């Protein structure tokens, strides 16, 4: 999927006039936002933030409550960072638990994230982020982690532009029906594989068009939307933006797709690997660094044989070096590793290449405007804040330490290029590498790594306790 990766100053001004955001989610000032909230007939506001798994956790508050906290703090129970994706409390994390009593944690509403939810009568919506009792960024909040890494980039004079693309499966089911069927024999939205199919998108035209149009109205503009290989599978590329806005869009995209799907009597899933016989779902992140003015792509060098600047080569070397140490940021759950298998459009080796879809890091450097790096390890099950933070932090590590890109670009089948090693094969293996890694703590912060590793160790333990269908089929009668 080609994602154009920078506009000229003129184009950016034009987009502002057209109210399509490049780096900002809205074009209303604080007074205009406040007035909109006052005037909205619903009398309520929706606010949300993500937990460690990227799940959007939020609530409605009254307009009166909103006005009382908009210039100070609101609060969420800190169990948001003390339980897993199924709301089961961790028994091994230090940050919060029964030992702390699960107190409220302060959260700040970010007015710059203001949006109107078009499928909820344009009710006002805001994202927030956790802070600690001293008003400092919370060490476990994913959005705060990304802001910390961004500050490191800005301090060096870099303006990161990012975007994410997602693949996902759609089923003609409901949340109730998939549970009633125990997630077996589900009916896909459309049968057959049909990648890039005009026919299949036309057969589900209302849903397909609603995705494109409603997401744009919610300020998640798409560059492209098409069917992907797999029954009922879609792929969307979100327009690039400055990194915080890009991550906000990606986080909101996943929840928005699920809500829009429900309006069309179907259910969307962003599991990385839904079936061993079907392709997995990627969540590739595209990235480039620009100068502070946003006018010069620092990754591009016309004189280089591969059109890559020395800075880009340092950045790639940093990602390759850090990747085995931070893989859970890109592959966060048990199922993630079912996707990372040979010959399934997901990488398995520590490789890079130019326009090569078999490697971990794909360089696209044809033009100054579009020159960027695509990190293909990332699955659709990822927390975008964490994935983008890890991409940027590891790239900056390579720049800061002037790492040389000594490894040659993989030509042809990257699955067979073992010259730099392979990716960890399970969540446990990857988590233990991250736990022991000094570089992970250096680039992401010791307190964050401690908490994140504890949550991944919990996830692995839950998996070990589970009795699977495979075990029943294999052992129930014969053993």
Q: Which functions belong to the PLM regions below?
A:
Residues 2-22:
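Short, low-complexity, charge-dense intrinsically disordered segments
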Residues 28-479:
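Glycine-rich, acidic/polar active-site loops that bind/position phosphate-bearing ligands
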Residues 1-2, 8, 181, 450:
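Short non-domain terminal segments
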Residues 25:
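Cationic, low-complexity basic patches in intrinsically disordered or flexible, solvent-exposed regions
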